[in-house]
Amino acid sequence: HTTVMKKYILHTLIAVLIGFSANAQIDRSQIPSSGPTPEVNLRDAKEFKLKNGLTVLVATDTKFPVVSWSLNLNNPPVFEGNKAGVQSLTGALLGKETLKSTKDEFAEKVDFLGASVSVNPNGGFGYCLTKYQEDVFSLFAEAAFKTKFTQEELDFEKEQLIEGIKSGENSAAAIAGNVRGAVFYGKNHAAGEIVTEETINNVSLEDVKQFYTDRFKPSNGFMLFTGDITVKEVKKLLKKYMKGWKSGSVTIPEYPSFEDVSTTEINFVDVPNAVQ
C-alpha cells in the first residue's frame, strides 16, 4: 500500500509540475495565432437551376440515412417604417397553420415523423430520415406556399412581440441594441429602425400577406440539399411540390448614405424608471 501511495503522490506532483510549466510558457500579453482556415469542400455537389431562377445544389452523402435542405432567398434588408415589426410577424405566422392543417395538426405531423421543418420570409430548412423525405418535404412546401394567415394568430403574435418589447424596456442590453443600430445607420435604415408597440399595432393582416408575397420569391435564391439523397430524387421533389412557384426577385432598396463619425461619441439614453 505504501508503494502504491508513493507512486500516486509522485504522479500527482509530475502532473502539477507539467501544468505549471505549460502555464509558464503561455504569454497572455500576445494574441495567439489563428489556426488554418477550414476548407468547405463542395466539389462533389451537383448544381442546376430551375426555370424560376432558383439555384439548387445537391451534396450527396450516404454515410447516414438522413437528409436536410436549406432555402436561402438572399433577400436584402427592408426598411419597414411605421410598420416596423411586419417581418417578425410574418415569420411568426409562416408555416404555423396551413390551408390543409390547423397549427396543432401540422406540428403533430412533423413530430410524428421525427423531423424538423421551419419557414420564414427569407427561406427555411428541413431535416428528416431519408425514408420520410417525401412526406417531410411535402410538409415543408405546405408551410412555404399554403400558410393560412389568420387575424386570431396575428393578434396572438402581436401580443407576444409587445410583451417582449416591454420586458426589455429596463434591459441595458436591449436599450443598447436599439441605440447602436440607430446611431450607426440612422433611424431611416433597415438596420437602424426600432420596433415599438405603436409600429406593431400599425401592422394589419393584409400587410403580413403582402410582405410575404413581395419577399418570398425564388430568382435570387438558392437551395442546398445534403445527405442521403440523389439529384434525381431532388428534381422529383421539386417538380412535384414547387412547380407552381413562379419566378420573381426582390428589389434592392436605396438607403440614404451615412458617414463614420470623425470623433469618439458617447451616447446617453434617459431611462426615468431605472433603479439606478
Regions found by a protein language model. Name each.
Residues 70-130, 192-194:
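M16/MPP (pitrilysin/insulinase) zinc-metallopeptidase core fold and M16-derived inactive scaffolds
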Residues 38-67:
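Mature N-terminal segment immediately following signal peptide/propeptide cleavage
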Residues 25-33, 193, 222-276:
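An aromatic/glycine/proline-enriched structural segment found at the starts
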Residues 11-19:
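Bacterial N-terminal signal peptides
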Residues 2-12:
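Bacterial N-terminal signal peptides that target proteins for export
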Residues 51, 55, 61-63, 72-76, ...:
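Solvent-exposed coil/turn segments that connect beta secondary-structure elements
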Residues 20-24:
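Sec/Tat signal peptide C-region and signal peptidase I cleavage site
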Residues 26-28, 33, 107-211, 256-257:
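Acidic/histidine-enriched segments that form metal/cofactor-coordinating
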